[in-house]
């Protein structure tokens, strides 16, 4: 019980108060002005010699508290240039202020947690989205069942604010935040709730990403607690966790109750080979045991979203599949567990035995059809995968055209170098290479054959295929045999922090 008390006090101490005064700190908007905003946004319709002023922020906040803040006469803009109602300026400057203020305490908390765990030096590698694949290669070959889950979006912005309210105790700050969201919803009252959230995410990306990420973080914190204590919980006891305010007190009580009354069933609900992976709004659950426990976790998620977060989910979209028969999509790869069968001959005295050995290996495959669809959308090929010229780039110089294609090819090759089968990757390189040649031929108003014969660009365009070998030769300069082995194997680059647009198929 002392351990839970320490955790409770630690979480309480991390609750940040008095965020409201930070709204009026000029350095907060200086950060927004320097990093995220186009400078013209802050000076539009203002006329302060192209300098933003804290007085603007104070006046905007005052207007939000007024009852008639939505009613602005046509003559107001003539009396004072500031009172000219500019929706983008009004929304963005306040939204950016909210985002920066609310990020400050949680960033400090995150930095301190990294220092406590002593993982500051390896943090850059942990940030890589490809750092999850070595984990999958190590764990998933021993698992049998997988479930692909899409985390549902909240239907209203107020839900996101309520989740944040449990961690930050500052009534004036949340009152102002609610006024801001209420003002936004009124200005877009003709939109459905789903479209309203989509519009808000585009017009206020930083604030929306923080609120959504915090919603996912809160959902995962409850899920991880349930995972750790799953040996003490049964499905009917799950409803006691829905009031977040008394969460930790109930946790202490439940551990005592279940340790006394359900000690005989502890081992039945324990699942040591159960793994969870998430990227953005998509999560993967995998387990070695029978689908019974996977079904229980499926119901846990549904009740958690609907009862605690007021988010409607579709149980029919959550399927439990066998890893050996089905693949799952994550981070631009189709992954599944492949069975490798080999026969070993063993001889003992006069007898000879043939032993069949079955080993499992995680296969990561490049999804060639979605990538061709993305390349067709970007006008590099048609829907069948036949390369076409990029006519929009025909006005650039030959060097710029080749450099653009090489950059795209380099990024895709860098990203998909972890594929088990390189054939699809070579096809993508071929499409980009031929599209580059057709673009150059279109620029010079010639056919592909005539252009190559006249300019002799074949050697230059070979960089599409030789660049990967050059990178490996820099990493392993004296090991030619190592290069030959690595050429057909998977290599995960831990400097990839995000995927490009051609990889985002969903």
Curated annotation (Swiss-Prot):
It comes from the Eukaryota. Keywords: Chloroplast, mRNA processing, Plastid, RNA-binding, tRNA processing. It is found in: Plastid, Chloroplast. One of its GO terms (cellular component) is chloroplast. InterPro entries: Domain_X, Maturase_MatK, Maturase_MatK_N. One of its GO terms (molecular function) is RNA binding. The keyword tRNA processing applies. GO terms for biological process: mRNA processing; RNA splicing; tRNA processing. The keyword tRNA processing applies. Its main location: plastid. Belongs to the intron maturase 2 family. MatK subfamily. HAMAP family: MatK (MF_01390). Usually encoded in the trnK tRNA gene intron. Probably assists in splicing its own and other chloroplast group II introns. This is Maturase K.
């Amino acid at each position: 019980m002392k351990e839970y008390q320490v955790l409770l006090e630690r979480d309480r101490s991390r609750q940040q108060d008095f965020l409201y005064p930070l709204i009026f700190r000029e350095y907060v908007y200086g950060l927004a002005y320097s990093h995220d905003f186009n400078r013209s946004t802050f000076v539009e319709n203002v006329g302060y010699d192209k300098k933003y002023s804290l007085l603007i922020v104070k006046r905007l906040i005052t207007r939000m508290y007024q009852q008639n803040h939505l009613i602005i006469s046509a003559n107001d803009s003539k009396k004072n240039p500031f009172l000219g109602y500019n929706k983008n300026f009004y929304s963005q400057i306040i939204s950016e202020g909210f985002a920066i203020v609310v990020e400050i305490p949680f960033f400090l908390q995150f930095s301190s947690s990294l220092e406590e765990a002593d993982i500051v030096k390896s943090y850059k590698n942990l940030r890589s989205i490809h750092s999850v694949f070595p984990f999958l290669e190590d764990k998933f070959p021993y698992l049998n069942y997988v479930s692909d889950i899409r985390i549902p979006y909240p239907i209203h912005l107020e839900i996101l604010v309520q989740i944040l309210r449990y961690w930050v105790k500052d009534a004036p700050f949340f009152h102002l935040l609610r006024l801001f969201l209420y003002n936004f919803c009124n200005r877009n009252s003709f939109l459905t709730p789903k479209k309203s959230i989509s519009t808000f995410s585009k017009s206020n990306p930083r604030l929306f990403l923080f609120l959504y990420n915090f919603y996912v973080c809160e959902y995962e914190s409850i899920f991880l607690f349930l995972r750790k204590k799953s040996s003490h919980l049964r499905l009917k006891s799950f409803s006691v966790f829905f009031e977040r305010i008394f969460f930790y007190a109930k946790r202490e009580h439940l551990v005592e109750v279940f340790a006394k009354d359900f000690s005989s069933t502890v081992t039945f609900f324990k699942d040591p080979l159960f793994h969870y992976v998430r990227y953005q709004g998509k999560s993967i659950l995998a387990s070695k045991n029978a689908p019974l426990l996977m079904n229980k976790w499926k119901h846990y998620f549904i009740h958690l979203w609907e009862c605690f977060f007021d988010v409607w989910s579709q149980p029919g979209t959550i399927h439990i599949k066998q890893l050996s028969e089905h693949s799952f999509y994550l981070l631009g790869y189709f992954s599944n567990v492949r069975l490798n069968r080999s026969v070993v001959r063993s001889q003992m005295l006069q007898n000879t035995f043939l032993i069949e050995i079955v080993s499992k290996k995680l296969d990561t495959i490049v999804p060639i059809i979605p990538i061709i669809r993305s390349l067709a959308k970007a006008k590099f090929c048609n829907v069948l995968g036949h390369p076409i010229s990029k006519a929009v780039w025909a006005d650039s110089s030959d060097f710029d055209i080749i450099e653009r294609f090489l950059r795209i090819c380099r990024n895709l090759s860098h990203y998909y170098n972890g594929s088990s089968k390189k054939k699809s990757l070579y096809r993508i390189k071929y499409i980009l290479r031929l599209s580059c040649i057709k673009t150059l031929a279109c620029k010079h108003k010639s056919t592909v054959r005539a252009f190559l014969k006249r300019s002799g660009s074949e050697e230059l365009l070979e960089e599409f295929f030789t660049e990967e070998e050059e990178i490996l030769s820099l990493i392993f300069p004296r090991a030619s045999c190592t290069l030959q082995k690595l050429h057909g194997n998977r290599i995960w680059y831990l400097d990839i922090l995000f995927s490009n647009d051609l990889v985002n198929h969903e």
